[in-house]
Design a protein with these regions (language model features):
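Acyl-group transfer acyltransferase/transacylase scaffold of fatty acid/polyketide systems
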Residues: 1-134
Length: 134
């Protein structure tokens, strides 16, 4: 769920559930609250030339393989303000036994989740793209 702090506080009082955990995040990512920043990001992306990727890319907005630079720009914009389709993304990746997933970023949260879902797939985590050679 995403919403204002006040709305989420009200909801947590009104519903009965086992656990209601508010995430400490810097923005309402992957929700309609990101529509305006997403539009600005889209304008920024129009100025950048994307090369054809060396390998297909999967976004959480549309969990399918994509190699089209223009479509990748659209997916980057759309995943800012749409829900994460994590299970579908993991299911797609599970179909490829030769897959090597690399999480690029400061934490290993996603690679940890992936290891639980994808038992036979190689998964690595690096802090920056500088650590990758292909």
């Amino acid at each position: 769920l995403s919403g204002s702090t006040e709305a989420l506080d009200n909801l947590s009082r009104e519903i009965s559930c086992k656990r209601f955990l508010k995430l400490n995040v810097s923005g309402a990512f992957h929700s309609p609250f990101m529509n305006e920043p997403s539009s600005k990001f889209s304008e920024y992306l129009k100025q950048i030339k994307f090369n054809n990727p060396s390998f297909p890319v999967i976004s959480n907005y549309e969990p399918s393989l994509c190699s089209d630079p223009n479509e990748l720009k659209i997916r980057l914009e759309k995943q800012m303000c749409n829900g994460v389709r994590w299970r579908e993304t993991m299911d797609l990746m599970a179909k490829d036994s030769d897959l090597h997933i690399v999480e690029i970023g400061p934490s290993n949260v996603l690679s940890g989740l992936g290891k639980r879902h994808l038992k036979d797939v190689k998964i690595s985590q690096v802090s920056s793209s500088d650590q990758i050679s292909y």
